[in-house]
Curated annotation (Swiss-Prot):
GO terms for cellular component: nucleolus; nucleoplasm. The keyword Acyltransferase does not apply. Ubiquitinated by the anaphase-promoting complex/cyclosome (APC/C) complex in the presence of FZR1, leading to its degradation by the proteasome during mitotic exit. However, degradation is not essential for normal mitotic progression within a single cell cycle. A motif (D-box 2) lies at residues 53-56. It comes from the Eukaryota. This is Protein PIMREG. Interacts with PICALM; this interaction may target PICALM to the nucleus. During mitosis, associates with HDAC2 and MTA2 subunits of the chromatin-remodeling NuRD complex; this association is strongest at prometaphase and decreases as the cell progresses through metaphase and anaphase. It comes from Mus musculus. One of its GO terms (biological process) is cell division. Keywords: Cell cycle, Cell division, Mitosis, Nucleus, Phosphoprotein, Repeat, Ubl conjugation. A motif (D-box 1) lies at residues 14-17. The N-terminal destruction box 2 (D-box 2) is required for APC/C ubiquitination and proteasomal degradation. The gene is Pimreg.
Amino acid sequence: MASQWQGMRTSVRRRSLLKEEQLEKKEVTRSAGGHPETGPLGSLCRQFQRRLPLRAVSLNLGNGPSWKRLESPEPEQQGLQAAARSAKSALGAMSQRIQESCQSGTKWLMETQVKVRRKRGAQKDRGSPPPSLSQKNTRLCRANRDARVGGHLRLSGQMGPHAHRRQRLRRESALRSPCSSTEPLCSPSESDSDLEPVGAGIQHLQKLSQRLDRAIKAEESGDMTVSLIRE
């Protein structure tokens, strides 16, 4: 209803203004006939005097954000901001280095796997694989055992009638040692990481051989004392 009343009022005002303009035009024509000089000046004045009716405009503006004045930060805040920037840059550099190292590690692993596979293929193409470290160790143990048995036989031949018994005991102890087994102690190494158990096996074999030597020496010393007492 209020909008309708406002529209009616504006229409009434326009009609009244149009009527006034028509009356002014009639007066201008009449005055122009009597006073021709004042005609254009009067029309200019009337054009400047014309005004349209103003309407009330409602500004539908909501409560906007409260803007604060931008101030320069304090020196303490500036120091904190600089420290935060340096920490961010350092963390970014560290993360980049870590990513690069991980990528290089994966590349190295892939390259080593490819090399190992190529070596295996070449060995299969050539025929029988070369002797591994475990096989070499077993051969060395057998050679040491043969040398010990030969030396013991010589000593037993020189010592007298009890040589056969001592020889039999030494053979039994030699056969009980792990060096006499034909199976390898360690599986053939496929990469450099398998060398550690091979070294541990070698050390174990050395300890066992030392114990065997001590036992043989003890038996020999006991047999010598017995033979001397009997003589």
